[in-house]
Amino acid sequence: MPNQESSEHDWHHLKSSAEHALGVLLSEISNHRDPQSLFEAYTYAKEVTARALQSRMLGHLPGENLKFRALHAEIQQEMLSRYQDVVPNNLLRTPYRGKTHEGLFSLLQEHLEQPVQAAMLRIVTGDNVHTERRARELRELGFDLHWQEEAEISIYELRSLDLDFDLIPSIVRNNARKSKSYSKDEKKLILKNAGIPENG
């Protein structure tokens, strides 16, 4: 994901392209004769506009979210305090710390205790199809993020900056499942020694 300075530069560059693409789309809608031309104008305008608005959004959000990183550090410390004597260190790493998750968190934090439509979150990712999955991954870490659907519209709300440490065993279990460093039997033994159910 681009940094804040490059996002501002990209926004000014892409804004003109988006204006042109939307103009072509409006023209195709007004003078609709060939369905294929209309569809092509729409898909192009959608792609260019998504990239332009992503740049504008990332220029608006902080380039580095210290609270996001502090919460990750809290989760990491809690994992280590519980399991460092029984679980290998490479399974005690906090996932989902990349720029995409950080950007989504920044937008949700900006609207703390307020509903945010999934469509707004998709601006952060350039309308990526996996945006809502990335948001739900924040919930897997124990972030106080709630989801509901209203009139078939997905709504997300970060209700506080508290963490639910009860989800830490599931983080370790998921890390073990994804790891290629251990056999299936080794993973079972690691989880058993840590007192973490294999299924959950």
Give the ranges of each region predicted by the language model.
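Short phosphate-binding/catalytic loops that engage adenosine nucleotides
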Residues: 143
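Short, amphipathic alpha-helical interaction segments positioned at domain boundaries
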Residues: 162-188
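Minor-groove-contacting beta-hairpin "wing" of winged helix-turn-helix DNA-binding domains
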Residues: 150-160
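Long, compositionally biased intrinsically disordered regions
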Residues: 1-76, 84, 191-200
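Short acidic, hydrophobic short linear motifs in intrinsically disordered regions
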Residues: 112-124
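Short alpha-helical segments that sit at the start of domains
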Residues: 73-106
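Short amphipathic alpha-helical interaction segments
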Residues: 126-140, 148-150
